Every structure is written in C-alpha cells, then in structure tokens.
Amino acid sequence: MVVGLLGGSFDPPHAGHVHISLEALKRFRLDRVWWLVSPGNPLKPRPPAPLPARLAEARRLMRHPRVVVTDIEARLGTRFTAETLAALRARYPGVRFVWLMGADNLAQFHRWDRWQGIMRTVPVGVLARPGAGLRSRTSPAARIYARARVGAADLAAARPPAWCFLNLPMVDLSSTAIRATGRWR
C-alpha cells in the first residue's frame, strides 16, 4: 500500500486541494491520499480556523473512495512533519508513504524543521501551484537534491531521497485568497 500524505491547514479546503489529490493518485501511482488536516502550522503567524470546522468542510468537499480526510496529527500530538512521519511509519509499518506538497511549499521547504530528514525518509511529490514554479525549482531544496529528482511514475517506488516536480493544469485558488474575501470563518 502506497499512501500520499497531503498535509496542510486546509483553512479552508478548496477545489485546488481536490485537484492535486486526484492528480497525485493517478500520476504518482498512489493507492490512497490522506489529507492531514493540521491543528496548526508552526510557520504561519496566525492560527487557523477551529480544527472541527476545517475537518467538516474538508470531508464535505473531498468525496473520493481513495482519499481520506484525517485529524491524525492532532490525535498523535505531533507538531512538525518529521514527527508526524516518524509516528505514522511506526504505526503503519507495512505502508509506504509519499509526502505531497504544493510548489509554494518547496520554495520554503528549507525552513521546515528537519527538512533534510524528511527528504531522506520518504519520497516527495511536488505539485505545481500558480506563481510558484520558478521559486520552487530554484529553491535550496531543489538545488541540494537535484540528482534525486525522478519521474512521476517512478516516485512511489523510489528510494529516498527522491522527489518529483509535477507540472499539471492548475486551479487558481488559494486558502489565503478565499479568507480575504470573507467567505470563510
């Protein structure tokens, strides 16, 4: 079983999250995608909407038999991705995990706690986001791990460090823009 992990605040979840999840299932040859709705992001200056509201909206929006919306990070008590990955790998030893992120996150991945450990632990699938292509492909992480880049169809079986940048048709939505309209919270 190969599970893609899409971590995020999902504040709010939107059609762009759905789109990249379905593309990741198909192009990275994943069996499942788990939306890890985070209790909070240590790199963001303001707290997100309450977790129950974000979970409920994510479950309403993402209705696919191979995508699971979960609050497992809150239940595990993990705060950083590296901790979450360690806990999930211990809890599910037979599952192969692939970390999924938008290109905007790759651009600042080097700021994450133990980011190089994440790269050495699981394959990483990076999905294009509007306006983030060049910044992500020239980021410190992309430069340091340039030789570890693999094709989309090979990512799930690749031995870490391995990563793939997936160009795909993009949905021009962002949680930040949705919040700015006042349609959320």
Swiss-Prot record:
GO biological process, one term: NAD biosynthetic process
Enzyme class per UniProt: transferase
Involved pathway(s): Cofactor biosynthesis; NAD(+) biosynthesis; deamido-NAD(+) from nicotinate D-ribonucleotide: step 1/1
Enzyme Commission designation: 2.7.7.18
Record-level Gene Ontology MF annotations: ATP binding; nicotinate-nucleotide adenylyltransferase activity
InterPro entries xrefs: Cyt_trans-like, NadD/NMNAT, Rossmann-like_a/b/a_fold
Pfam hit, one: CTP_transf_like
Keywords, sorted A to Z: ATP-binding, NAD, Nucleotide-binding, Nucleotidyltransferase, Pyridine nucleotide biosynthesis, Transferase
Substrates-to-products reaction catalysed: nicotinate beta-D-ribonucleotide + ATP + H(+) = deamido-NAD(+) + diphosphate
Described function: Catalyzes the reversible adenylation of nicotinate mononucleotide (NaMN) to nicotinic acid adenine dinucleotide (NaAD).
Family the UniProt entry places it in: Belongs to the NadD family.
Name of the protein in its database record: Probable nicotinate-nucleotide adenylyltransferase
Gene encoding the protein: nadD
